[in-house]
Regions:
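Amphipathic alpha-helical dimerization/coiled-coil segments
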Residues: 1-7, 25, 81-110
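Beta-hairpin "wing" of winged helix-turn-helix
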Residues: 58-68, 74
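N-terminal helix-turn-helix DNA-binding core of bacterial DNA-binding proteins
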Residues: 6-47, 70-82, 86
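Short, hydrophobic-biased segments on the C-terminal half of alpha helices
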Residues: 53-54
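Charge-dense, helix-prone N-terminal extensions
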Residues: 33, 62, 106-110
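A cross-family signal for key residues in well-ordered alpha-helices
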Residues: 13, 25, 57, 63, ...
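Conserved catalytic core of two-component sensor histidine kinases
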Residues: 50
Length: 110
């Protein structure tokens, strides 16, 4: 049996790498040319950065627009917001329960 990755899985995958998170932070300040992003990572070069951009694009986190030979990268924060809100909503009851237990333990120790 083969696991089918959901769109949420693609977003979590995209967020799972420090370089991709830095690209997201940089794009949060506004669209950037691919060349500008390549300069952030001289150790992996253009090919490496393009692979990271592909992962972010696959998750819908960034959109690439071409103007002639220039590639402009734009952030779309909505997929990140959506997947995080969904995850928190799914786990909030367990988090609240753990917080309540922790509070009771702390009160007993006082």
């Amino acid at each position: 049996m083969t696991y089918q990755f959901s769109h949420d899985d693609l977003i979590w995958k995209a967020l799972g790498d420090a370089r991709r998170r830095l690209i997201i932070e940089v794009l949060a300040t506004g669209p950037k040319q691919t060349g500008d992003l390549v300069q952030l990572f001289p150790d992996i070069g253009r090919t490496g950065v393009l692979k990271h951009i592909d992962v972010l694009t696959e998750g819908g986190i960034i959109h690439v627009r071409r103007e002639g030979r220039t590639r402009w990268n734009h952030l779309d924060p909505e997929p990140i917001r959506s997947v995080c809100n969904s995850w928190v909503a799914k786990h909030i009851d367990g988090i609240k329960s753990s917080a309540t237990k922790l509070k009771l333990i702390a009160e007993k120790e006082q």
